Amino acid sequence: MARMHTRRRGSSGSDRPTADEPPEWSDVDEDAIEERVVELAEQGHDPSQIGLKLRDEGVQGTPVPDVKLATGKKVTEILEAHDAEPELPEDFRNLLEKAVRLHEHVEANGQDHQNKRALQNTQSKIRRLADYYRGDKLDEEFAYSYETAREIIEE
């Protein structure tokens, strides 16, 4: 499948091994994993960072290779169940942060045409994602602009 804003195709990579149950060496209790997920979310970590921390550091010293295999729920589902989910979806927030950084860079460096184009592409992705999340995770009246993005990021 081609990429969104280029004519090139994506690079292929290896797939995650298919597994129906967690490995024997990772025998952590589901409740302990959920507690650790909520604890990390309260510390301000994003769902992807929580997954990385559980993979690297683990719970009680035992790594958790896959939260969904161990608990039957995704990290975001655990956060929703404990009312600890972030206000905005992680992918949307990351795009807003990128757009704010690019906008400030383009303001300071007006001749940087490559990053002007990158800003346009990022804004296009934000508008597409806003259409997807509008009504569910975003307000119905949400419209992207640099000012609204900066306000959201500064919160």
UniProtKB/Swiss-Prot annotation:
Residues 21-33 have a biased composition (Acidic residues). Residues 1-10 have a biased composition (Basic residues). Part of the 30S ribosomal subunit. PANTHER family: RIBOSOMAL PROTEIN S15P/S13E, SMALL RIBOSOMAL SUBUNIT PROTEIN US15. Belongs to the universal ribosomal protein uS15 family. Keywords: Ribonucleoprotein, Ribosomal protein. InterPro entries: Ribosomal_uS15, Ribosomal_uS15_arc_euk, Ribosomal_uS15_N, uS15_NS1_RNA-bd_sf. Residues 34-45 have a biased composition (Basic and acidic residues). This is Small ribosomal subunit protein uS15. One of its GO terms (cellular component) is cytosolic small ribosomal subunit. Coiled coil: none annotated. GO terms for molecular function: small ribosomal subunit rRNA binding; structural constituent of ribosome. GO terms for biological process: translation. It comes from Halobacterium salinarum (strain ATCC 700922 / JCM 11081 / NRC-1) (Halobacterium halobium). It comes from the Archaea. The gene is rps15.
